[in-house]
Amino acid sequence: MENKMTKKTILTGLRANNDLHIGNYFGALLPLIDMAKAHAGEYQINLFIPDLHSFTTPIDHSQLQEQIMNNTRLFVAAGLPLDNPDVHIYRQSYIPAHSELTVILNSFTGIGEMLRMTQFKDKSSKLGADRVSVGLFDYPVLMACDILLYGAEYIPVGDDQSQHIEFTRDIAERMNSRFGDLFVMPHEVKKQHEFFGKDQGLRIKDLQDPTKKMSKSDESGKGIIFLSDDPKAAAKKIMGAATDSIGKINLNYETQPGISNLLQILALFTSEPLDNVVARYEGKTSYGDLKMAVAEATEAFLTEFQTNYSHVDMATVEAKLRGSESTMNQIANQTLQNVQKAIGIR
């Protein structure tokens, strides 16, 4: 496959339309930025904003454009290197080839394949039949196009997306077998995990219900710390976090999920190994002291992060987007033309 990129490509999506919280920061923003810094130079890093994916389930469209630009700014505030020529940031909808290739690949995809997708099953069961869109059903085909247009070999995804990587490999192999060498085959999921390595396994939980992950679905907002929260208000949320009646600090996710969550948050905010934090507090009886330490670390983190956010130059961000989109359009259009010629419409 002809590709204007001379380096192998790593591709991943930036969250488009959700208000981001500290769980997103440590679970997605920071790992993504660390990955980009670690591999830029040897690899081309494609970071795209999946705005077409963002409304496969119902959203408030009046907020979408603002959220897209805000979240892009958040990634830059977290350290995304805009000045690195190997790092490309682009909006999915600004590359028409994503949609055009999706229409083509739909005709080479079986309904049965889509019906077997566990993420579709999970989301559709929660939404109900009258709210399930064709876009949600077809999500894996668009995701395959996101990958195949640029010859991406490595795509860091969670377990919930692994099935989509395997589908991407299947459709690439199917098209290559029938029409020749059209697509670069992304590596199998096992090799993806080997390449990116295993994460440290720390997952921030809801402050009020530490048995579940921190999520925007908490309507009260008391269990979530958003990156946009007032630092002092966030510290108060920490002080009001649910704990237990055991009366002694231990790291035990089953019997003391609230205390364990606070220990994890402190480790993440201070960049200390969790074992060191646990050793410092284990066996102590003052939950208040632990909460105070976490609250102070939270306030300090948000104050610094929001200062960085305020200093992000949006003109520079928009210039980076436009430059990346120009480059990506050239690459994607070449791939699309190869496919169009192969199937006989050019």
What are these regions (language model features)?
Residues 12-14, 91, 151, 208, ...:
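Pocket-edge structural micro-motifs
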Residues 111-115, 149-156, 267-277:
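Short helix-capping/linker segments at secondary-structure and domain boundaries
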